[in-house]
């Protein structure tokens, strides 16, 4: 008997077939919907593949057809156009998400991959707190975090804006160095404005530094960018090997598929380095604010995008071959139209141009004509201490906290406002962009913290590291690609602890100037110095205390320099002066110490009576020739400066020890108002910190940065700023406090790798208007001011030409990690 033909009831392998009357009951041509005659699975089999980037059981083994986004056909692996989940859906292989964490000491790369490719993936505006709070809703990102290396957070550079930080990540440069100081700016030398929507954005004159795609190409590698600020600009005359012109409407999935296709290219064309960028969760965070259901959905979208990338890598057997860095440029903060500071509340007429928002700047509106003559100081003065609860502080760029590295560029307008969290500063009440969320604030704010996760054969597994700055990522990427980095602001080797086998081993800085000898000499005549000290009854005995024998000097160094003598990396004439309780490096060039170092215990015992003050008891140091010494007569009343002590005399419990500190080699020039801060810090805060931390090693000294470039001024530059006195006035003072992470240990017996540091770079100014402190008790403002001006030890080194921790018995990369640490003080919403 002849078998009857089974009726067709599916569109499988029939999509876009020619219409047939015989099959009119179950059609799969492109007009069947109009006739309402499609097979039941027409939508899933024929339509969905043109809209979906995923396989499903119905699609597995499908017949090839045009216009599909990706294929689930049997030959898709050969054709290299499979959907990324083809193997897990159609071949029942374990998905990357369900795989166990890989554990291998070596790269697992397929044939043809001699070196692990590197992918840099940015999720714009992904603040670190999102991952802490919503990790269970982001399984792919959470797995990457669990299996690879991640930081608690990565600190953005200031201002915490998109273009600024993306370009910092690929150059290792601060905004002031690479020139992209904001998403909007003016350059008086170019007489041009820069904006994200303007044509000038593609003018290479705006873009400084060497982005990593150029570093790679200059050293024989290939680089591809799927959207990245700067990648479509002809920087230094060239583009990346492959790049895409930005188009925000391009689906995230299309971006991932293209990056994966780059990895399918023949070796001769395949990029060694690729970037991938998506706008979420930033776009949604701006619209709805960081704490919103919409942001959670955008995070899940971002998570699926990562999952698609990892599935695609696994399908190519590259998931344990590729090194992947997943990061963000900045965080996100909630804003409200009820939290606006209007310039019209401070000025009768707002006769200037203002970049409004979370990181405002002010300049002349008539440029270039009035650019240089604009009275910035008058603007700052009118914006200072005007309201009891003012939600911003106005700074001249040169007075901003040094940790921001935001002064040394003509594009940085002189007037800058540091705005409180969740507030905006704007011109007037016409401002409308004040709902939802924004960013740009101080990079120490928790809400501005960004994510950093890394996975691949180059990175350690299941490792959490402490926070670091995004200027360090460029060097890290160069190490993964075995490249020599271009000059940058990062500290090369400080992220070695992220890597299984670090490529670069840092070398100790070479000292330029070893100390000279200052010999104990005859007592100079008091008439020469103008100094007096009537309370000293036996001057010879007091001076003889400064003539320590070698054994006493060694003991002083053990007590006061437990981590080694700071090395001097500039040409300088100085000598070490040993006292029982402190050591100083006295400079013959600037007539004051380069640094003083001492250690105080948890139970600092102060004298029952206050020691004599500098005004009534100060004498010349007999170890310093008179012509190389400060004198009391240098401090004339009309100079508004007073001698301040680097080592406080009242830190010595006995009278004779106090006289060891009442010498001209221990004094530095201070404005009287600054001395308020300095004295309160030493009398109240230092003992408190010493109690909390079981003792402290303290190193402090002057800084000279008159050209505010973040680096120490040469002595001939300093000489230009000495007026009516032979004493140069420091622009800042630094303090470096070192203790032990384990509070049962003291700074003197702390084991290697366990040190904890807290550093400050304090602007030396003649008033305390920054804190509105003229009539305020010191306890209400000093500590907050100091926290504002916290800094990395590395910042102190750059500004002083010193090299700290020279004798630590640990790998240098661990010391660099300590030097690049920036302490954070959690700021409440004001």
UniProtKB/Swiss-Prot annotation:
Tissue: Expressed by venom gland.
Residue positions binding a divalent metal cation 2: 124, 162, 329-330
UniProt enzyme class: hydrolase
Domain SMB stretches: 7-50, 51-95
Active site, UniProt feature: 162 (amp-threonine intermediate)
GO molecular function list: ADP phosphatase activity; metal ion binding; nucleic acid binding; nucleoside triphosphate diphosphatase activity; toxin activity
Pfam families referenced in this protein's UniProt entry, alphabetically: Endonuclease_NS, Phosphodiest, Somatomedin_B
Motif Cell attachment site boundaries: 35-37
Family: Belongs to the nucleotide pyrophosphatase/phosphodiesterase family.
Higher taxonomy: Eukaryota, Metazoa, Chordata, Craniata, Vertebrata
Protein name: Venom phosphodiesterase
Assembly mode: Monomer cleaved in two subunits; disulfide-linked. Is synthesized as a single-chain protein and is subsequently cleaved to form a two-subunit protein held together with disulfide bonds.
Carbohydrate-modified residues: 16, 193, 236, 247, 489, 723, 742
